């Protein structure tokens, strides 16, 4: 498969600036995105003449804070309309965000934001938890949680169509109602759900230990997620890694996106990519606070090790501890493909940083050593 670094740099710029998703923007915001895209980001003025290095530097960076602010503001705006509409129907709801945007590991300037709409009238719980065993949960509701979520979804769909008449309200998804266009400056995914008190949260009383059950209307059933624990644990390890973990996650997500554009099949979800790097060497990632390309080196080493040690890889859990990362054979095959993509990128960066590598077919270990000691001028 041919890897075109010039094309990948263009695609990276389009993703980060939002010009890749003009179709979901209204005309005013489309013009704003186009205008802002004319001015290159700081990474485009570094490593000039070293395209692979420049790509890695850009792929690791957080999306412009102004883009993220707009995404969060639009989610809040949608939440306010839903809150008013649902309360008028006698429903008490709460709102939280989940996913890549609140975790700051999104790679698109125009990113969908996941807005949880939580039915506050009830919650479910682990019957093995301490509060449940003590008999503290003794006021059952007269309806099933699943029927409540189905009703919540129906009400939310109706309200969104009424409050955002010019927007596209896509209700075909199993878990999310997707809004885009019209007066919305960014796409918002509305996810009907309710709280679930886990055994842990019954002890700690911390919201990050609470789960949420999300409606999957295609079955129908509710699915337990732990989005707040996931975000907290990514944030904790990122701080321990001197903010190198999130850079590594963004890098892998960008490489995956560009490889797919070129025809590769890498069915490894963003959640699992973050989970993979959560298990990387934090000290090696922390070195990226001085030697930025050390983050590339650790991502390459870590993926290569897992790809060569399937038995170990399959023991690794997602950060919230709810399941193995590689719970399907397809995901492990995707890891191998992503590892090969990273190997190729690392070799090309290594050759840009050390001319001696032009004359040999270097081993990955040689490439990693070059990346760990390379300094890219600002």
Where on the chain are the PLM-derived regions?
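N-terminal regions immediately upstream of nucleotidyltransferase
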Residues: 1-96, 102-110, 122-139, 317-323, ...
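Catalytic cores of NTP-dependent nucleotidyl/adenyl transfer enzymes across multiple folds
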Residues: 72, 76, 142-305, 372-377
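Histidine-centered divalent-metal-coordination microenvironment in nucleic-acid enzymes
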Residues: 100-120, 178-191
